[in-house]
Design a protein with these regions (language model features):
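PRPP-associated nucleotide enzymes
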Residues: 1-224
Length: 224
């Protein structure tokens, strides 16, 4: 399948590899916090991380709480979400957090010192580029992804086939999601998780809106 579907077991496997082989949680305790507003996909990810690490990590619901949980000031912060598509949402959220009058300076200092990282299941190349530009000291962990409709290296093969699929996705995507026919911020993703489908994925995969008087039946719903 050209759709990258991550089952719960796949997610556990990816996170285990990153946590123990890349972040190396056994050698140092970190404070894990979900990215963005409460109730978003980051919360689901944070819960899974808790199930994996148990008391090997510390966990917080927001930045203010996370900073208070740094017992001796040595713990790093790991910001958690399932997916980084364009990187804009995460970057904008961080920009707001670092100007918070209560804790912004402390967070900004930690970022400058390389004490903040991001954990995701998948991070698109363009998200990594944007984060590197706006926050060069933040390491982004996650499997790499790229746009589906590239002229070189597309998952659909050569340009002729790729263009045909792109036109198909755009035609129906424009009816289902006029502002983002190929996914949020033109992400052109084919990513699906067992718990949800990112809106960066092309809408023909997840939308259940109607075209005319016929409702579109998604292959995978936006939320499981």
């Amino acid at each position: 399948s050209l759709i990258r579907y991550y089952s719960y077991d796949d997610i556990l496997s990816v996170l285990n590899t990153i946590l123990f082989e890349q972040i190396k949680v056994k050698t140092k305790k970190q404070v894990f916090i979900s990215i963005g507003e409460s109730g978003k996909s980051g919360d689901s990810m944070l819960y899974i991380v808790q199930q994996i690490l148990r008391d090997k990590g510390l966990y917080a619901n927001n930045i203010a709480e996370a900073l208070k949980k740094r017992i001796n000031g040595t713990e790093d912060l790991v910001l958690v979400d399932d997916f980084l598509g364009s990187g804009k949402t995460t970057s904008d959220w961080l920009k707001e957090e670092i100007i918070n009058p209560e804790y912004g300076k402390e967070l900004n200092d930690m970022i400058a010192e390389g004490k903040v990282s991001i954990l995701s299941i998948v991070a698109m190349d363009r998200a990594i580029v944007l984060m590197s530009k706006n926050f060069p000291t933040i390491q982004v962990y996650g499997e790499r992804g790229n746009k589906a409709f590239l002229h070189s290296g597309s998952v659909f093969g050569g340009s002729v086939t790729m263009i045909a699929y792109r036109e198909l996705c755009y035609k129906y995507g424009a009816m289902l999601c006029p502002k983002a026919p190929l996914g949020f911020e033109n992400s052109q993703c084919l990513i699906v998780f067992s718990h949800s489908t990112p809106n960066n994925t092309v809408p023909i995969i997840w939308s259940n809106k109607s075209i005319g008087n016929k409702r579109w039946t998604p292959l995978f719903p936006r939320f499981a």
